[in-house]
Each structure stands twice: as structure tokens, then as C-alpha cells.
Design a protein with these regions (language model features):
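Predominant activation on well-ordered alpha-helical scaffold segments within soluble catalytic domains
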Residues: 8-9, 26, 100, 104-108, ...
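Active-site nucleophile and cofactor-binding loops and adjacent substrate-binding regions
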Residues: 69, 165-166, 201-208, 233-237, ...
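General beta-strand structural signal in soluble alpha/beta enzymes
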Residues: 159-163, 187-191, 234, 257-260, ...
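Glycine-rich phosphate/diphosphate-binding loop of Rossmann-like nucleotide-binding domains
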Residues: 200-315
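Structural motif corresponding to the C-terminal cap of alpha-helices
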Residues: 216-223, 325, 329, 350, ...
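Rossmann-like adenosine-cofactor binding region
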Residues: 263-369, 374
Length: 451
């Protein structure tokens, strides 16, 4: 039995109630055995056993008062996974589906993702089962303040620097930052994704979507191709999707469709990111609980709204597919439909949106598959640049930040591509990303001794 299989079997026996975490561990451990074969010292130091267990998990209750004066209680978490190469870094997710197993999966992915950025950032993830949808600004402020009243004890600019994620945007980050400052009497860059008036970075909002497209574009360039004239479908309509749509259009491609939890919209003229952004902001405001992506067709009469499962976008003929919503939203049958309809490239804008079965199908059928831990690293990359600006008490221009983002994302593609070639798996970007990210963390852990 291989070292990776032994560790994976132990994880499955220990955490049977954490399927998302097991899925992430399976995807990673299933591809890094060649690196372990080349470095037997990793097994001697029980490095994998240490890598797959978080350094620390913080769990706490979050009591808050709603607009009716009723006390509500949610559960809060922070998984501080690995700090071998820098302070813990990773987002906070507010969503009813949040569980410890989900955050462990996201945290493990974050460790390798942050390693790939080349910036000194460890990996972590956190959040709560609080649902911000339909809540008033006052309720969200009360919740964020209560959440930070416990979390502040465990974070800091050189310890753990959270950011936003699903359900946590600039508003929520601002409320949490204000509470942290109030509790500590200290202004530090303890959160990223802040507003521009108090230490935020230009291009942070656009970073994940732009970075995804830069990464895919560098793949296309390496094969003598480009986005020019390409038809693209996007699953999702949130922050990542909006700016992926914008950047695809800037590079000459056309996004045919995007989706939300209520259905999907198809626009033969190409999805207009400004309308998409307007709908997203209406949803986020909380003033109208009935807002869905169907509003898009009110401003774009040529567009067609399809009620139902947003996964309908995968049935369209396209050259490139960009899943930008959430985990496990591109299934095997979706992969089969995409391949049958001529899709040649898939780039993950979300965290693990593609199931292992779908990923395997893409790889077996010649589709270039760009895993999220590399392709969607633009957000955390610019978070790292925000940390640098805060530490230096500087503010860079949009062009400076975007230029660094583009340079690092394009460089990241070549690191992943070259690593896959080095281990005899040219075109296997999953293996390339996992091994490249793993080696940096593994060497740092080995150098620091048993800790």
C-alpha cells in the first residue's frame, strides 16, 4: 500500500462524517505520490499525517439579536490549517451549509493555493452557518460584531488574516474590522477585502474573476491560441462570475450564459457584466428578498431566462466553461454534456466546483482542466498584496495591483505546467498544481522540525 493511500484510509476511518474534506484530501493525495517517491524523507517525518490535520480549530457560538428583538444563535468556526510558510490566510464563509468538514476541505485547499501564489501565506478558513440572505443591514452588523467578539482573540496581522468568501463581502468585512478595532484599540491589517477608505486594495473585488481569466488565457497562449472569438459559459453570477465575464469580453470572448440558484440566463449578444453587477448589488442590499438573476432580462430583452437548476448552462455548446459558484456544481453528466458540445477548456473559479468523477472525465477526453487551487488564486493573491500595502502604509494604483495580479497568475500557470511535465504528466494541471503547492509547504515543514 502506498504512503498516500495509507494516510487517506486513516482519514476516511477517522472522519466519516466529513465528506467534503475527504473529497479534497482524496483529490490531493491521489496526485502527489510521484513527489513522495522522489522524497522518502517526507514519509520518515510523517509529513502527510501532519499536513492533513489542522494546526488548530476554533469553534464558538455566535449569539445576536434580530430586528424583532429575538435572540438568535449560530455556530462560528476558524480552521487554522497550516502556518509553515506564513500566517494563516483564507476567507470567512457565511452560509447555512457551513460545517466543520466543509471548512476543513476549504482550509486544506487554501494551504496549497496560497503556496502556489509564491507569497508568504499559510492556509486557513472559517465562517458560520449564518445566512445573510434576506437579513437587514442592522442584523448583519449585529451578527458580524458578535462573530468578531470571539474571533478577535485568535487572529492578527502576523498570526491569522481572514478575508471574505461566500456570503462575506465588503460590508461584512467592514463591520468585523470595526469591531476588531473597537476591541483591541489597534488599527492593523488584520482583515483583507477592506474598503478603500480604510486600508483596502484596489482590484481586490475584481481579483478572483480577473485572475481566473488570466490563468486560462496563459494556457491558451501557451498553445498558440487566445480568448478571441471563443464562446464561454459561466456557472454563477456573484463576484467571481461578474469580473470573469468582464475580463473575457475585454480579451475578445463572449459569455453566452450565467446562473444563480433560481435558474440561468442566456444572452445571444453576450452577457453584459454591468447588468450582472447591478442584479448582484440588488441581491446584496437585502431590500427586496425576491431579487433573482431573472431581472437581467428586464434590461436585456434579447436574453432568455430559464427557471430551474442553474446547471442548465452546462448544456450549451461552448469552447470554455468557467464554474464560478460553489462546490460540486459540475457533475459527471454535466461534463459529458460539455464534452459532447465541444468544450475544450474548463477553469475553476470556485473552490472544488467539479466532482472528482467529472474531473476524470474531462482529463480522459482531452479537455484542459484548470483546478481551482491555481485558477482561482487571484483573490487570495491580491489579499496578500493588500497585506503588503498595509504593512508598508502604502496604497498602490489599480494598474499596479492588476499588473502584479496578471504577472503572478500567468507565472503560476507556467509553474503548474512545468511541474506536470517534470513528473511525466504533461497537461495534467491537477497533478501539477498539487505537487507544486505541496513541495513548498513540505520543505518548509521539514526544515522547521516536528511541530
Amino acid at each position: 500500500m502506498s504512503y498516500t493511500q495509507k494516510v487517506l484510509d486513516e482519514l476516511k476511518a477517522r472522519y466519516p462524517e466529513q465528506p467534503e474534506f475527504i473529497q479534497a484530501a482524496t483529490e490531493i493525495l491521489g496526485t502527489i505520490q510521484p513527489a513522495l517517491d522522489a522524497h522518502p524523507e517526507y514519509e520518515e517525518a510523517a509529513l502527510l499525517e501532519r499536513l492533513v490535520e489542522p494546526e488548530r480549530i476554533v469553534m464558538f457560538r455566535v449569539p445576536w439579536v434580530d430586528d424583532q428583538g429575538k435572540v438568535q444563535v449560530n455556530r462560528g468556526y476558524r480552521v487554522e490549517f497550516n502556518s509553515a510558510i506564513g500566517p494563516y490566510k483564507g476567507g470567512l464563509r457565511f452560509n447555512p451549509t457551513v460545517t466543520l468538514g466543509m471548512l476543513k476541505f476549504l482550509g486544506l485547499e487554501q494551504v496549497l493555493k496560497n503556496s502556489l501564489t509564491t507569497l508568504p501565506m499559510g492556509g486557513g478558513k472559517g465562517g458560520s452557518d449564518f445566512d445573510p440572505k434576506g437579513k437587514s443591514n442592522n442584523e448583519i452588523m449585529h451578527f458580524c460584531q458578535s462573530f468578531m467578539t470571539e474571533l478577535y482573540r485568535h487572529i492578527g496581522p502576523n498570526t491569522d488574516v481572514p478575508a471574505g468568501d461566500l456570503g462575506v463581502g465588503g460590508r461584512e468585512v467592514a463591520y468585523m474590522f470595526g469591531q476588531y478595532k473597537r476591541l483591541t484599540n489597534e488599527w492593523t491589517g488584520v482583515l483583507t477585502g477592506k474598503g478603500l477608505s480604510f486600508g483596502g486594495s484596489l482590484a481586490r473585488t475584481e481579483a478572483t474573476g480577473y485572475g481566473l481569466v488570466y490563468f486560462v488565457d496563459e494556457y491558451l497562449k501557451s498553445r498558440g491560441d487566445s480568448f478571441e472569438g471563443k464562446n464561454v459559459v459561466v456557472h454563477g453570477s456573484g463576484n467571481v462570475a461578474i469580473y470573469a465575464v468582464q475580463k473575457v469580453a475585454q480579451l475578445g470572448g463572449k459569455v453566452l450564459a450565467c446562473s444563480d440558484t433560481h435558474g440561468w440566463v442566456e444572452d445571444p449578444d453576450g452577457i453584459d457584466y454591468t447588468v450582472l453587477e447591478h442584479v448582484y448589488n440588488q441581491k446584496r442590499s437585502g431590500h427586496d428578498k425576491g431579487v433573482t438573476l431573472a431581472m437581467y432580462v428586464d434590461e436585456k430583452p434579447n436574453a432568455v431566462w430559464h427557471e430551474g437548476d442553474g446547471r442548465g448552462v452546462w448544456q450549451l455548446a461552448c469552447d470554455i466553461a468557467l464554474p464560478c459558484a460553489r462546490e460540486n456544481t459540475l457533475l459527471l453528466e454535466d461534463a459529458q454534456a460539455l464534452v459532447a458540445n465541444g468544450c475544450k477548456v474548463v477553469g475553476e473559479g470556485a473552490n472544488m466546483p467539479t466532482t472528482i468523477e467529472a474531473t476524470t472525465y474531462f482529463q480522459e477526453n482531452g479537455v484542459a482542466f484548470m483546478p481551482g487551487k491555481a485558477a482561482n488564486a487571484g483573490g487570495v493573491l491580491v489579499s496578500g498584496l493588500e497585506m503588503s500595502q498595509n504593512a508598508e502604509h502604502l496604497s498602490w494604483t489599480f494598474e499596479e495591483v492588476d499588473g502584479k495580479l496578471e504577472q503572478l497568475m500567468r507565472g503560476m500557470f507556467h509553474n503548474v505546467d512545468d511541474t506536470a511535465k517534470e513528473y511525466g504528466e504533461e497537461g495534467n494541471f491537477v497533478m501539477g498544481a498539487n505537487i507544486a503547492g505541496f513541495l513548498k509547504v513540505a520543505d518548509a515543514m521539514l526544515a522547521q522540525g516536528v511541530c
